[in-house]
Every structure is written in structure tokens, then in C-alpha cells.
Amino acid sequence: MSNFKLLATKLWVKILCPTWSFIVNCFYWLFRLNRLKKYLPIKNDYSYLTLNELMSKFKWKADNLKDWNPWVITIIARDLVDDCDGAAVLAKWWYKEHASEGRIVILYSADGKLGHAVCVREDNKEFVSNNEVVVLNPNNWEDDLMQKFGNKYSVII
């Protein structure tokens, strides 16, 4: 990935995507605000599931819009259907609910045309990719992560 493309990608990931995501989430709830109370108890129920149970309910679907990160309540309102960004957001929320932390890591191919979001637990011992929870070697987690995807990605943001 060229320096310019890498800089543009980092700008998108760190600044533009969160702004765009806020707009998309607000627009989504603008016409559904009256249903918000319905999803709060479901969110609470999901917090009692194991991570494997929760992620097994997740269904991957390609984005219709430019890439965006849904809020957890938005993912729940959409019946746990989203793309890899939604899965990473959901896993990060689950870790926080269970006194741990996770971070969203974005993987890109060398040419920048192929990208994927995952959530890596704070101790680097596991990551979540769509509906899978995968064990990592914490001492060499970056290389292990790349190998889990057959080395089709080479850039971590």
C-alpha cells in the first residue's frame, strides 16, 4: 500500500468513518426512535450470553452503503445482521460488558482493495471475525492473525 493510500485509509478509519457512521446511525433511528425501548431488554439479554453464543447468532451481510460502523443497538435492531464492522463492534461491546476490553483492528491487502475488520481482545489471546471467535498466540498475535486469513492481508490499522 502506497504511503498516500495508507494515509488516506487511516484518515478514513480514524476520522471520516466515525463521522459517517454517526450520520447513518442517526438517520436509521430517526424513523425508528419509538422502537428503541423494544431493543434495550434484548441488548441486556445478549449481555448474558457467552461470546461464542452471541457471535453464533450474528449473520454477515455486505454493506449497502459506504463502509460504516453501526451502534450496538442498531445491530440488535437489525437482528444481528451486518458486515464485519458490525461483528467487530458487537464483540467489542461484549468484552466491555464482561470486564475486559477489545479493540477493532482493520486489515488490508497490500493493494488496499481488500479490507476486513476484526475485534482483538486486549490480551491478544483471541479475536472475533464475523461469527467466529478464534484463538491467537498473544506473543506473535499480528503474524498469527495474518496467517488465520491465509496471508491475504498485509496491513494492520
Region annotations inferred by a language model:
Residues 1-157:
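A structural boundary/capping signal
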